[in-house]
Amino acid sequence: MGVIEIHRILDEVRLLGCSDLHFTDRIAPVVRLNGTLRTMRSQYPEMDEEEILDIIHQMTNDAQQTSINNHHDTDFSFQTRSGYRHRVNVYFQKGKPAIAIRLLRNDIPTLEDLGLPPILADFAMRPRGLVLVTGPTGSGKSTTLAGMIDFVNLNRSAHVITVEDPIEYVHEHKRCMVNQREIGDDVPDFALALRAALREDPDVILVGEMRDFETIQAAVTAAETGHLVMSTLHTTSAADTINRIIDVYPEHQQQQIRTQLANNLVGVISQTLIPKKDGTGRIACMEILNVTDAISAMIRDNKIHLIQSAIQTGKQQGMMSLDQELARLTAKNIIGEVDAIEKCQDKQEYYRFLSQFGGTPTGGMNISQG
């Protein structure tokens, strides 16, 4: 086959509304559309190693090619001639190169555009503390954080420092001065960037991902010393998120980190993407924890198991459980019951909330009205 021109195929799949593009050996290019993988075999034949290497060379500079050769796993950002940005991961499988490309929006979506709850704006405007957006890969965490940073940029005079691997959304200076640092090009790793940030007079620090103990420790310290820190984890609930952070600490330091989280954690947004029933894309579905005094006491006293029930009864404080939100969206006919059940944490709770929202289950579940 002829050489694939990366600029052209990326523009092509963007027009189709795809979120991801994959190249791997012995299969045609593969896209992800509305969460589902589809091959482009009708437009392109199978790829081979030489063609994939050619695509890599089209996207990389000498330093990136050296990193790929040395590590066999490299992240970087790539901009097409049409001006659109992409997050690229080059990796090896069975000794051969493969590429995963995430298509990014050029415009930074507002919290309103994303249909996100007002409490996220409240979290974004806090003068200090730790805000975490969590969820599996591809759940829209970076987009939610971009919307929150943009809200800060429009509504507050502040110095914002982001540390990302790679930079996904490019923020202009609006009311804020925004400096964005990319791992590899600007700084070696997240932990070092966080420690350096404390000497750079920031008000708000965005950490793309809290990957290890050193980064978590540095993020908590930054929040504790008077900065608003936003970051992500790959956890699926608020309680899991808190436990994950505590568990990375040695046992003799765990009471200390409980106290630090109790004093500094502002909120946890755990999200997943669900296909819309009308087939027009996916919608973010969230569990939201607002760390009130009562929640702080639960964290400090190691009663994390009580947090889930506190979320369910915390509507007045802007909280909601994932099952509540899934039930609400099902009752409004925005998502389907089968998709909701696949993502829910507790099927009985989901159906109980569905009944409260006036929804009618189709799965044959007998709902108690008591």
Language-model segment annotations:
Residues M1-G370:
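Short, flexible helix-loop junctions that flank or precede catalytic/ligand sites
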